[in-house]
């Protein structure tokens, strides 16, 4: 375990994990592993050790600062995560970061990703993840609104969100049919997250700070792509032609 930790620390210090992800992505691309018939955007929480701070310290951290008393206690400061944030989803509270990914809908390989604090809404990742000429993109109901539509239009990408019902404004029949069709495709991204959680234990990180957590999440995404590539090759799952 210490050997792996030291190896990961070396990669993190030299900012090499994300370049390694890009190199492997290029190798996958050269072998036609991305079908480019469609892609899915979604996010999963990566929890970290919960902090025990006073109200004053919490307010300082939330404002982007570091409590004064920590500056004289470097050992204590090293054990404090000032980057992770709290958020709430479906009645459950999470503390940590968020792995926001762009996944090829046919191969289920990760094309790109960005790491944010858990409190950052999914729609904020849209700008970082979609690129000019991307295929039709299936996004969740959080990635809607004028700003998201503008980004998609500027990059010539057709975004297909899961439409949301509002009070006194239920979905009509056409919207419900669209949601069912889109959900059948988008559910494949949950297979990616399930593999990460069960096989790579990605739901929780022991690292402190965004730099180390981003590196750990990047490594998880890289290892997932390696595992998925081996699975596609071994089982002969590649039945598409690159668009």
Language model features with spans:
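Composition- and surface-driven signal marking solvent-exposed, interaction-prone regions
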Residues: 115-116, 149, 207-211, 233-241
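Hydrophobic alpha-helical membrane context
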Residues: 54, 134, 152, 202, ...
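Short, acidic Gly/Pro/Ser/Thr-rich loop/turn segments
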Residues: 110, 163, 229
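Amphipathic alpha-helical protein-protein interaction segments
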Residues: 47, 220-222, 226
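Polybasic low-complexity intrinsically disordered regions
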Residues: 1-154
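Helix-centered, glycine/charged polyanion-binding patches within enzymatic domains
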Residues: 62-64, 131, 135-136, 141-218
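A short, flexible helix-boundary coil/loop motif
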Residues: 178, 199, 203-205, 230-243
């Amino acid at each position: 375990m210490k050997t792996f930790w030291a190896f990961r620390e070396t990669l993190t210090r030299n900012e090499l994990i994300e370049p390694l992800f890009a190199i492997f992505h290029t190798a996958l691309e050269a072998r036609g592993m991305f079908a480019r018939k469609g892609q899915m955007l979604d996010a999963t929480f990566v929890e970290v050790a919960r902090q025990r701070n006073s109200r004053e310290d919490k307010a300082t951290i939330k404002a982007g600062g570091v409590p004064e008393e920590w500056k004289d206690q470097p050992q204590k400061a090293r054990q404090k995560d000032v980057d992770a944030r709290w958020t709430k989803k479906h009645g459950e509270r999470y503390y940590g970061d968020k792995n926001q990914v762009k996944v090829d809908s046919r191969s289920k390989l990760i094309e790109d990703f960005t790491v944010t604090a858990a409190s950052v809404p999914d729609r904020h990742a849209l700008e970082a993840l979609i690129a000019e000429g991307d295929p039709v993109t299936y996004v969740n109901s959080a990635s809607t609104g004028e700003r998201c539509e503008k980004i998609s239009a500027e990059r010539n990408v057709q975004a297909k969100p899961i439409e949301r019902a509002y009070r006194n404004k239920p979905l009509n029949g056409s919207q419900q049919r669209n949601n069912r069709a889109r959900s059948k495709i988008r559910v494949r991204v949950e297979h990616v997250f399930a593999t990460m959680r069960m096989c790579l234990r990605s739901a929780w990180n022991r690292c402190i700070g965004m730099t180390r957590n981003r590196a750990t999440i990047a490594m998880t995404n890289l290892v997932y792509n390696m595992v998925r590539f081996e699975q596609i090759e071994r089982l002969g799952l590649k039945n598409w032609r690159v668009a």
